[in-house]
Amino acid sequence: MSDQPLTEAEIELALSDLPGWSHVGDRLEQTWTYKGHLQALAAASAVGFLSEQRDHHADLTINYNKLRVSTTTHSAGNKVSAKDTDLARAVSDLLE
C-alpha cells in the first residue's frame, strides 16, 4: 500500500464510503460512544491489536465511555494516505 499522501478529492471520495469518519487537519478521525468505560477500553484494545496486525498504528483516546480513533501516515509527511483509509475501513468493520 502506498505511503503517498492522498489528494483532497481522494480523501473526500474515501470518506463517502466511511460513515462517521471525518478529515480533521491531516488525520482521519471517528469517535464511538459506549455504555461505560470498560466497553470503551475493550474497543480500544481491539483496535490496538488490529493496528498491530496491519503495522499501521492509530492514535486512541479514551474519555470515560468514548473512544476516539485518529490516524495519519508518518511516512507520508503526517498526511492521510491509503493506509489510513484502509485502517479506517477495518476499524469500522471491527467496531460496528
Each language-model region and where it sits:
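N-terminal first-folded block
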Residues: 2-34
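Alpha-helical scaffold segments that form or flank carboxylate-/histidine-based iron centers
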Residues: 30-38, 73-76
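Short arginine-rich
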Residues: 20-23, 48-58, 96
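Mid-chain, well-packed structural core segment of small domains
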Residues: 51-72
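Short amphipathic alpha-helices within nucleic acid-binding modules
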Residues: 38-44
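Solvent-exposed alpha-helix faces
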Residues: 45-46, 89
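C-terminal structural segments of small proteins and small subunits
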Residues: 68-96
